């Protein structure tokens, strides 16, 4: 394409340019694929506009973007149903020890795995806090500059604690031995201090 000056990474179907106010979409001949990508990109348009309006309403004119894993995860979450393909990606990442925690998302930045993990995180957020957690996050966007702080203000839980709970839920879901029992850290408490025992 000559719409943008650089090459699109593999797996990028469409993109939203907020500053230019446009969305670019492919037309591969598959109407279901086109509709899914259109929904995904319209979620970006909606969320970028919502964040800008919330900030503007509170006199803040600097745009505070969300982390990419969240924006792409939310766009996937709101544009399609969870699939067995998503299960396959997460299971493979977990089994091969490549599953990234939220704090490690920069290692998989922009990859399909990041989109899938982000979608999984959004599903877990909705299950844990209720579907309206996303609206509450956006309405609180003006209250802090960092996503972690907005998350804490909205949910009452640190992003690190949430991350640990999300990773634990994936292990329970995909690792049969843990599903039958539990991790040692969840069943027992530490009885010793530092050093060798």
Where are these regions (language model features)?
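Amphipathic alpha-helical surface "interface" segments used
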Residues: 62-67, 95-100, 186-191
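Juxtacatalytic substrate-recognition/specificity segment
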Residues: 1-61, 65-67, 85
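Preference for long, solvent-exposed alpha-helical segments and helix-linker "stalks"
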Residues: 42-46, 74, 91-95
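Short secondary-structure transition/capping segments
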Residues: 24-41, 101-107, 180-190
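Active-site-proximal alpha-helical
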Residues: 69-70, 74-85, 94-156
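Amphipathic, soluble alpha/beta structural segments
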Residues: 59-77, 172-179
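Beta/coil-rich, acidic/histidine-enriched accessory regions frequently appended to metallopeptidases
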Residues: 109-112, 136-139, 143-197
